[in-house]
Amino acid sequence: MSNISVIGTGSYVPNDIITNDFLSTIVDTSDEWIRTRTGILERRISKEENTIYMATESAKEAIKNANIDANDLDLIIVATLTPDNFMPSTACSVQKEIGAINALCFDISAACSGFIYGLEIACSMLKNSFRNKALIIGAENLSKIVDWEDRNTCVLFGDGAGAAILSKTKEEGILEFHSGSNGLKGEHLTCGVLKANNTSNKNDRLEKNNFIKMNGKEIFRFAVGAMNETICNIQEKTKWDLNEVKYIISHQANSRIIEYTAKKLNTEKDKFYMNLDKYGNTSAASIPIALDEMNKRGLLNKQDKIILVGFGGGLTFGGAAIVWSI
């Protein structure tokens, strides 16, 4: 059976920057309060860009980086909790924009774990079918579902998209996964839909319930536990010592979560790649944006061992062990 490798990456973030100082003018907060509790200095916010546009731009970059044609793609999976439409799917819209006429396309919703879930689904589909190449995208427009009057959430989130191309290969590549869900604790991180009554009565109003709501303490506790469990499980499956692992690329939610996880694993914080100071929490986009940034910066070399790990709403979690092949 063929192995599956990452052969290209891409990303897109909006140009508009919202700083901590700006947020201090609209809610009761400060740059010092946000920095010390989250590690975030600024985040990117879309104005004209929607989820489809950002996903498409990241896809174009990944295709170019992989040195393939869009027609080579057999599968497109988009992980997002902020689609522009219920239908067509974001993946089908990306297919149209890039001309990937041969690809099977669908979206998944697993919040901040979405990119990891997408990788696992794609690997399974490639290994067990005639399909050879897949495009996995994490894309989010979180600024549209943030309550800008809630200082506990509006300081955390940003917009962006990241993508990776997977291909069958004879080389080592994506080796192992560990993933799971805990719906029993789903109420700790929620975002409702816009409720409609399907009535012609002009006096009926839509109830706006589509803001992110979060129990920060419970999510922090879950995140540290899920990260630790996932990394340890992947170590057990691969027999990797953490000293062999060049980087751990985690979901970029909060620097304190990463620091606590590093302590529990008895490893240095610098092993965890972080860029949340620039982008904040971009949910499903955070891991692929970081992966592309590292690829562009030349931080990853062929045969480097890396671990991806995510956690998020659902509640969900997941991780992957990868031998880098670019």
UniProtKB/Swiss-Prot annotation:
Coiled coil: none annotated. It holds the Pfam family ACP_syn_III. It comes from Clostridium botulinum (strain Loch Maree / Type A3). It is found in: Cytoplasm. Belongs to the thiolase-like superfamily. FabH family. Residues 252-256 are annotated as: ACP-binding. InterPro entries: ACP_syn_III_C, ACP_syn_III_N, FabH, Thiolase-like. This is Beta-ketoacyl-[acyl-carrier-protein] synthase III. Its EC number is 2.3.1.180. The keyword Lipid biosynthesis applies. Disulfide bonds: none annotated. The lineage of its organism: Bacteria, Bacillati, Bacillota, Clostridia, Eubacteriales.
